[in-house]
Amino acid sequence: MRGRPTIYDDYNIIKKAQEIFWQKGYSATSLSDLQKATGAGAGSFYNTFKGGKKEVFQKAVQERRLAFDSFKSQLEISESPLELIKDFFISIADASKDEHFKGCIIANTVVEMTYIDEDLEESAVQILKDVEQMFTGAIKQEQIKGNLQTQTPPEILGKYLITFWCGLNTLRRMYPDKNVLKNQIEMQLAVIS
């Protein structure tokens, strides 16, 4: 006879938990919120996530890492990686107002976890550093190919794009308007044109 499946195996459970963390932040999300959002009973939840809320949050954040890893794979095979990076940023302007208000769960985590939880903060910081390296690598390759005229070192441009990403996380909350965001994004991305 087969036992109950564990909820951890269900990708949708992690996505549902991620949505609550994204909306409320780690500190404001209760175990009750997570159980309600995921439909998991207390016993099942605690048996699956022995590390409690922190473990669920770590898995939700790591799920976002997978999205960045997928983007990195696309960059590596793209004939126009700079255009792909630009499209990535420009697509943010098309997001819904609710998505603008949520911002980026990774950047949000860095801000929220400073002085609260060093492990969670460092995990989010590492994801942003990995994205920075992804941008840096793509820029470096395009400079080598002669597809990018700027002589600014790729490491500086990679950090610039992460700085822009984190600033955009705030700007989109201030101005959740597609046209305002698109204009700002295009202006900021002129550095890699």
Which residues does each predicted region cover?
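Short, basic, alpha-helical segments at the C-terminal edge of helix-turn-helix-like DNA-binding modules
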Residues: V61-A67
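Helix-turn-helix
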Residues: N12, K16-E55, K59
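C-terminal peripheral helix-coil segments that are non-catalytic and often amphipathic
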Residues: I90, E132-Q133, G137-Q141, M174-S193
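N-terminal intrinsically disordered/low-complexity leader segments
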Residues: M1-I7
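Amphipathic alpha-helical packing segments from all-alpha helical-bundle domains
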Residues: S73, E83, E118-I144, I156
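Amphipathic alpha-helical segments used for helix-helix packing
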Residues: L84, D98-D119
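Hydrophobic alpha-helical connector segments
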Residues: S73-K102, P154-L161
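Hydrophobic alpha-helical segments that form the core
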Residues: Q151-L171, M187-Q188
